[in-house]
Amino acid sequence: MPWLQVRLAISPEQAETYEDALLEVGAVSVTFMDAEDQPIFEPELNTTPLWAHTHLLALFEADTNAEMALAHLSLLTGEELPEHSAEVIEDQDWERSWMDNFQPMCFGKRLWIVPSWHAAPQPDAVNLLLDPGLAFGTGTHPTTALCLEWLDGQDLDGCNVLDFGCGSGILAIAALLLGAEQAVGTDIDVQALEASRDNAGRNDIAAERFPLYLPEDLPHQQADVLVANILAGPLVSLAPQLATLIRTGGRLALSGILAEQGEEVAAAYADSFELDPIANRDGWVRITGRRR
């Protein structure tokens, strides 16, 4: 059965208005999708997670007049519609188009992120199987990519790793597959911990190698490597705490930082770490260094 699919690029502030309006003009389903693989931070319980750049997908019966539906939508919202498109798709094509958004990706020399439904392009490589779920990080966002490439370039054999703000668990699981002995994950969101646990199981990671905690339950033990792909503000305020969680000589990688925020974040860590040059990609940066 074919469907009319309408896609709109919205902000989080527009989400409720457009969801209600689309349902009123006849949409049979409304779905929110992350436009940039931007991690979610501190979503409210029992609410729909939203991203800074969100795509809203609405499905209508195939015989719906797209122009009339969009005109009605504009009247209901009382504003000019944001960037949008409309097309008729088949059921099978709709599912395939969603899956086709997630192709295997290589990071560094060894590491591949592979959707669980896709064959690994290089079976002998380090392949991390991932199902994009609540969009806690799939590798497509520059901050995630910067961290994955850094991990791929490290000697992690026998290391203990702390993933602070673990989201999907992608960084911790990558570290384990790259040779780390254990990775600890912590996140403020129980949904993120569930996603991490599911993805660890998908990669045959035993639970004892990847314990997961809410921040208030995190044991105080020093890691050989700490990665934190969160936001600049929390990274600055957490700098003293994170410094205590890394042993002397241990390694640090921070991201989730806009280029214009890089110097401020680096300054917060400069007293405790010997910092490397800041790595930049598409307006985002990664800060790395060693604990003094």
UniProtKB/Swiss-Prot annotation:
Keywords: Cytoplasm, Methyltransferase, S-adenosyl-L-methionine, Transferase. GO terms for biological process: methylation. It catalyses: L-lysyl-[protein] + 3 S-adenosyl-L-methionine = N(6),N(6),N(6)-trimethyl-L-lysyl-[protein] + 3 S-adenosyl-L-homocysteine + 3 H(+). Coiled coil: none annotated. InterPro entries: Ribosomal_L11_MeTrfase_PrmA, Ribosomal_PrmA_MeTrfase, SAM-dependent_MTases_sf. Its EC number is 2.1.1.-. It is found in: Cytoplasm. It comes from the Bacteria. One of its GO terms (molecular function) is protein-lysine N-methyltransferase activity. GO terms for cellular component: cytosol. Its main location: cytoplasm. S-adenosyl-L-methionine binds at residues 144, 165, 187, 229. Belongs to the methyltransferase superfamily. PrmA family. This is Ribosomal protein L11 methyltransferase.
